[in-house]
Amino acid sequence: MDWQKNLLLAAIAAVILMLFIRWNHFQEQLPQHQAGNTPAGSSIAAIAPDSNGDIPSAVPTASDTPQATADSSKVELIQVKTDNLLVTINPLGGDIASVSLPRHFAKLNTPDEPFVLLDNRNNHTYVSQSGLIGTNGTDTAQGRPLFNSSSTSYELKEGSDGLVVDLTLQQGAVNITKRFSFKRGDYLIGVEYLIDNQAETPWSAQLYGQIKRDSQNFVKVSALEMNPYLGAAITTSEENYKKIHFEDIAKQTFETSRQGGWVAMVQHYFISAWIPDASSQVNYKLRKLGDQDLYLLGFTTQPVVVEPGSKGVIKASFYAGPKDTERLEEISPYLDLTVDYGWLWWIAKPLFAFLKFIHGFLGNWGLAIIGLTLSVKLLFFPLSAASYRSMAKMRKLQPKLLELKERYGEDRQKFSQEMMKLYKTEQVNPFGGCLPLLIQMPVFIALYWVLMESVELRHAPFFGWIEDLSRMDPYFVLPIIYGATMWIMQKLNPQPTDPMQARIMNMLPFVFTFMFLWFPAGLVLYWVTNNLLSIAQQYVITRQIERADSKA
């Protein structure tokens, strides 16, 4: 039995160590440059054409569109406010220069300071660009068009479900409107080019959309922490979800073509993504911009032709917001995979769905975790009961095992043979206490990923001192309770016959308590609840067996 227990402990220790490392990897820290919504005329930089070619290449342009020659820093930016988004649009090119999320705080204790997702200040570049290239394209390496707008401030009014922001441009006899569409309660922005061709010749151009970002990670980390993943992701014909790190893009440009799809910039809890029209054939390209620390993740459509006297529409969508699984799944196939639950996603997704279902009734994510733990415990009740019965029988055999240990202590081979005979005589399965616990480990690992990746748990309070279930317990109360419950469970289990193993077992509650100090409070809450339920179940089963033996 000792070697089997060692095997179980080694497996659990390996899982705990792996999760500890991954928790350090995903532990969210606060960005150093967070800021709220940017008013017009603020210090945010207007985006001028880059000399190293941030505009995608296309066929040579024949556009007679007036190109911006004014000082780009003096361009008055356009502010857009909805219930979910605070957006700054630069009329020079019509790019999205910044996005803040008022429903998600930059810090737990600053609800008036929205989380800044896209930004272009403080030596940091993260913007969303779009334009027209090709024969009659308005965007070239020599300049970007300067759009006109009827206002520099737009706000979604009470009682209104949508907001439209139009930027206009005159290209000879062609009227071009760049339209941004916003919906109440949504983070998806519609981007359309409305072409009214009053010229005598066909008009042709290609739509491009791209995310331009540096590789800087403004996450604070301690000696015990690692940075969360920050990088590109894309769906291809070969892979539904493919991560591409900055260093990989720096080594080699990534290109692919497909119908529809998406390309995204992924970070912990949030993403930005370009989603072309699902019916369009699209070329995707991820590249580094010259020798600069700037990366471009974008797409280019096939040429769109608008005949003389006709009108045309070229459209795409841009998402900037939280990793909301249900919403991302609605927007585009496989975009929800940016909520990365790891290789056990097939367990994690229904777990989260059930957790969300319970939260709908209880209204508190901590109580929902307790409810989920109870449900999982009931699901595995037969396995747990079999495990605890096996442990109770093993505990009864402890005096006989100690007697064998004293008799054959120097002859380990003989001791093992006699021990197996004893198990057979008493009809005890030495694996009975281990395998049921190992079978439950995938559920624990999947739940770990759910708690790590679900933005719903970011800044979600429990009770009292726990104000954020996605972060560590600030006063270490739950880890200490966990250690105490683990110690009690050990006392209910059969003790190792080897003194060294017994000392190691006695140290494990302290070791795991120390490791759990940096785990998210929600995960430790799950383990504390699970341990308390296990103690109660094991105590009842052990007493039932002892009473049955006393009657016999």
Curated annotation (Swiss-Prot):
GO cellular component: plasma membrane
UniProt region (Disordered), positions on chain: 32-70
InterPro entries: Membr_insert_YidC (IPR019998), Membr_insert_YidC_N (IPR028053), YidC/ALB3/OXA1/COX18 (IPR001708), YidC/Oxa/ALB_C (IPR028055), YidC_ALB_C (IPR047196), YidC_periplasmic_sf (IPR038221)
Chain intervals with Polar residues compositional bias: 32-41, 60-70
Major localization class: membrane
Keywords, in A-Z order: Cell inner membrane, Cell membrane, Chaperone, Membrane, Protein transport, Transmembrane, Transmembrane helix, Transport
Membrane topology: Multi-pass membrane protein
Location(s) in or outside the cell: Cell inner membrane
One Pfam family here: YidC_periplas
Keyword Secreted appears in the UniProt entry: no
GO MF annotation terms: membrane insertase activity
Family affiliation: Belongs to the OXA1/ALB3/YidC family. Type 1 subfamily.
Function: Required for the insertion and/or proper folding and/or complex formation of integral membrane proteins into the membrane. Involved in integration of membrane proteins that insert both dependently and independently of the Sec translocase complex, as well as at least some lipoproteins. Aids folding of multispanning membrane proteins.
Assembly and oligomerization: Interacts with the Sec translocase complex via SecD. Specifically interacts with transmembrane segments of nascent integral membrane proteins during membrane integration.
Name the UniProt record assigns to this protein: Membrane protein insertase YidC
Organism (species): Cellvibrio japonicus (strain Ueda107) (Pseudomonas fluorescens subsp. cellulosa)
Gene: yidC
